[in-house]
């Protein structure tokens, strides 16, 4: 069995700055990643240990073992890194989905801002406005993806977070919120009121309001949305 060259030694034989660069090298010698994972200093630093777990050359058994031990921040880093092994990203995402129900509100809020796409629908169903507000600032969240998430039943926390977000003046979002609101107002214990429609009505021009009103079922909401044009004799 061949041994790593001196340049591929582990701390303390090599300085830590060099070791951290080696963790990102695409072709480490056989056995080196396993040795790195056993370093006591690395075990204490999950955000560094994740570089071993996500390495494309990490053996499958090592990857699975490490990912099972990583905390959510390190898992989120793996799941969001396009350079990580695809299996590592998938396993990290699945682990985050398992952890979500037991995470604190503060942890959920932090994760929501950078969560991988497979978690978006799970986050969107969270009835906590602060978590939703963080999610709506996600740098990868686009208009099309957001509109797809806004479906009945619309919840008060969702409506309020949207109304306070950067999306509050986007016409496609306004149209989708009004449709979801229309189908949710009559549901038992919806917690919604006609007033939730106000910011979205203001976001639409008269022509868009006319079209939106034609698609609504609730008479009261339809009257609110419909532009009342004055007629001239």
Labelled PLM ranges:
Residues 1-233:
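Alpha-helical scaffold segments
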């Amino acid at each position: 069995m061949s041994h790593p060259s001196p340049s591929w030694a582990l701390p303390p034989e090599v300085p830590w700055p060099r070791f951290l660069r080696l963790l990102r090298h695409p072709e480490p010698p056989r056995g080196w990643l396993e040795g790195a994972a056993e370093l006591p200093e690395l075990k204490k630093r999950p955000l560094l240990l994740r570089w071993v777990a996500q390495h494309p050359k990490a053996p499958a058994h090592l990857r699975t073992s490490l990912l099972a031990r990583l905390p959510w921040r390190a898992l989120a880093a793996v799941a969001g890194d396009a350079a990580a092994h695809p299996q590592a990203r998938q396993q990290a995402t699945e682990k985050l989905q398992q952890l979500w129900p037991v995470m604190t509100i503060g942890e959920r809020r932090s994760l929501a801002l950078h969560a991988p796409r497979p978690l978006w629908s799970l986050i969107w169903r969270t009835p906590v406005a602060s978590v939703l507000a963080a999610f709506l600032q996600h740098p990868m969240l686009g208009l099309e993806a957001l509109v797809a998430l806004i479906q009945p039943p619309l919840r008060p926390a969702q409506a309020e977070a949207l109304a306070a977000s950067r999306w509050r003046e986007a016409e496609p979002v306004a149209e989708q919120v009004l449709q979801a609101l229309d189908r949710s107002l009559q549901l038992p214990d919806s917690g919604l009121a006609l007033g939730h429609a106000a910011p979205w009505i203001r976001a639409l021009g008269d022509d868009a309001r006319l079209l939106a009103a034609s698609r609504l079922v609730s008479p009261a909401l339809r009257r609110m949305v419909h532009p009342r044009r004055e007629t001239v004799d």
